[in-house]
Amino acid sequence: MSDSITNPENSEIQTNYDKIVHKFDELKLKEVLLRGIYGYGFVDPSAIQQRAILPIIEGHDVLAQAQSGTGKTGTFSIAALQRIDESIKAPQALILAPTRELALQIQKVVMALALHMDVKVHACIGGTDPREDAEALRAGAQIVVGTPGRVFDMIERRNFKTDHIKMFILDEADEMLSSGFKEQIYKIFTMLPPTTQVVLLSATMPKEVLDVTDKFMNKPVRILVKKDALTLEGIQQYYINVESEEYKYDCLSDLYDSISVTQAVIFCNTRRKVEELTKRLTDDSFTVSAIYSDLPQAQRDTIMKEFRTGSSRILISTDLLARGIDVQQVSLVINYDLPNNKENYIHRIGRGGRFGRKGVAINLVTDRDVGDMRELERFYSTQIEELPANIADLFD
């Protein structure tokens, strides 16, 4: 089950660190951790794991450019579990993620890998009772996975003692730093021991990310996927020119009449559009779930569970879902709207082809969107083809 379909070839990776590890056994990991890795279904390290786990274990600051589906969660989870001192019952590794869903996903992976270890992993996220966080932190959680707002709050209230923190890992750093978390993240940096190792993972390297590396990282090992390697392999990308906004729904209906798809994710740019589309599809007898950031956490969890178990066939979402949620049976992603943020395109279409599955991404494009689509093609060095007439063949 290695999450490595988008492994770039070694020639497509630029790095200032020359050690490559081809087998997990070569990393000299704790025996109990190795059992967890193989038990989880990892066989061999993905390209990013071959290069990034070792420098993290060695204590270097690491800046890794990797998008969803490359095995990056396994990379920092394995390294953190190797570095943790199980006898110290206090937070030693702090992992930040931009959304609650991604934080919970990471927590699940860390706990699965730590199955045979005496390690407590706590998710410190908004939408839950802060008293539960305080209790879990007091009870000796050694790895804390959280969202910036809640983590900052817990540290500020002195419920989260940072004296033993040795690793600070920022996942999806580009998303966090562009989503208004920058100030909180900077403050968290200042509340950690000065010797804390910093590991930063990001699909793209905008100025905000590079500023953090300059300010808070010490001679980082850089593992950067070349720009033109950022398109997800295994995803066939198409567009339909719908001319104008009012024709999008009819186009979507026609699409569903033409193809047989087990499950699909449809992305819209606003909550209002998610709600409108959900209502129209439901009125037309489709089984639909909708998810967006304002929903209470319990409701979001229920919706994701329904979709994962297959009781809902269509999930309509804002970009909340675009990062890090593993829904393995999804073969089709539809961008009802092109994303406002170019970086989110890769996360959206990456839903469809994780874990070696092929996926199809279809973009509904108005005449006004054509320029933005061409810009996406340039940005990712890719081609988005017009959807062919024999579209049913794509889903055989």
Curated annotation (Swiss-Prot):
Domain Helicase ATP-binding: start-end pairs: 53-223
Lineage: Eukaryota, Fungi, Dikarya, Ascomycota, Saccharomycotina
SUPFAM superfamilies: P-loop containing nucleoside triphosphate hydrolases
PANTHER family noted in UniProt: ATP-DEPENDENT RNA HELICASE DBP3
Locus of motif DEAD box: 171-174
Span(s) of short sequence motif Q motif: 22-50
Domain remark text: The Q motif is unique to and characteristic of the DEAD box family of RNA helicases and controls ATP binding and hydrolysis.
UniProt function note: ATP-dependent RNA helicase which is a subunit of the eIF4F complex involved in cap recognition and is required for mRNA binding to ribosome. In the current model of translation initiation, eIF4A unwinds RNA secondary structures in the 5'-UTR of mRNAs which is necessary to allow efficient binding of the small ribosomal subunit, and subsequent scanning for the initiator codon.
Oligomeric and partner information: Component of the eIF4F complex, which composition varies with external and internal environmental conditions. It is composed of at least eIF4A, eIF4E and eIF4G.
GO terms, biological process: cytoplasmic translational initiation
UniProt-annotated location(s): Cytoplasm
Predominant subcellular localization, coarse grouping: cytoplasm
UniProt superkingdom: Eukaryota
Protein name per the record: ATP-dependent RNA helicase eIF4A
InterPro entries reported for this sequence: DEAD/DEAH_box_helicase_dom, EIF4A_DEADc, Helicase_ATP-bd, Helicase_C-like, P-loop_NTPase, RNA-helicase_DEAD-box_CS, RNA_helicase_DEAD_Q_motif
A GO CC term attached to the entry: cytoplasmic stress granule
Keyword Ribosomal protein recorded: no
Similarity comment: family membership: Belongs to the DEAD box helicase family. eIF4A subfamily.
Transmembrane regions: none
Natural source organism: Eremothecium gossypii (strain ATCC 10895 / CBS 109.51 / FGSC 9923 / NRRL Y-1056) (Yeast)
Pfam families to which the protein is assigned, alphabetical: DEAD, Helicase_C
Reactions performed catalytically: ATP + H2O = ADP + phosphate + H(+)
Keywords from the UniProt entry: ATP-binding, Cytoplasm, Helicase, Hydrolase, Initiation factor, Nucleotide-binding, Protein biosynthesis, RNA-binding
